[in-house]
Regions:
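TRNA-recognition modules of translation machinery and tRNA-sensing kinases, especially anticodon-binding
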Residues: 1-126
Length: 126
């Protein structure tokens, strides 16, 4: 639930700094309530599966937290559901994850939805 703020810096983070609920620990490190699960999953893979050379797929459901409303300090708890595919940077892997997303949305009963892809390298590959 708690993460170091540095994990979510501009280069790697998915939440804006002003949307994170921040505080300090006893060592004066800046901590945040987790705004996104992806870095935590990536850290676990790097630590526990560093010897793996084959594709690895993970899925999760977890609570994430963002501060809504400028300067209001209101905390919003959001259930994040995600899937990650590691050890494959091919366009086929990207297509697999997009297909999984679409299948899950359809299975949930949604008939109309929009998917936004925010990774510039994916569009360069197209």
């Amino acid at each position: 639930m708690f993460e170091y703020f540095d994990i979510f810096n501009k280069e790697r983070g998915t939440a804006a700094s002003n949307e994170m609920f921040k505080f300090f620990d006893r060592g004066n490190n800046t901590l945040v309530l987790r705004p996104d699960m992806t870095p935590a999953i990536a850290r676990c893979v790097a630590k526990y599966f560093r010897e793996e050379t084959e594709q690895m797929r993970f899925c999760y459901t977890a609570q994430t937290f963002v501060s809504t409303g400028q300067y209001k300090g209101k905390l919003q708890e959001v259930t994040q559901v995600g899937a990650e595919l590691f050890m494959d940077d091919s366009s086929d892997a990207d297509a697999e994850m997009l297909a999984l997303t679409i299948e899950c949305l359809l299975e949930s009963g949604l008939k109309e939805f929009q998917i936004e892809v925010g990774h510039a390298d994916l569009f360069r590959a197209l």
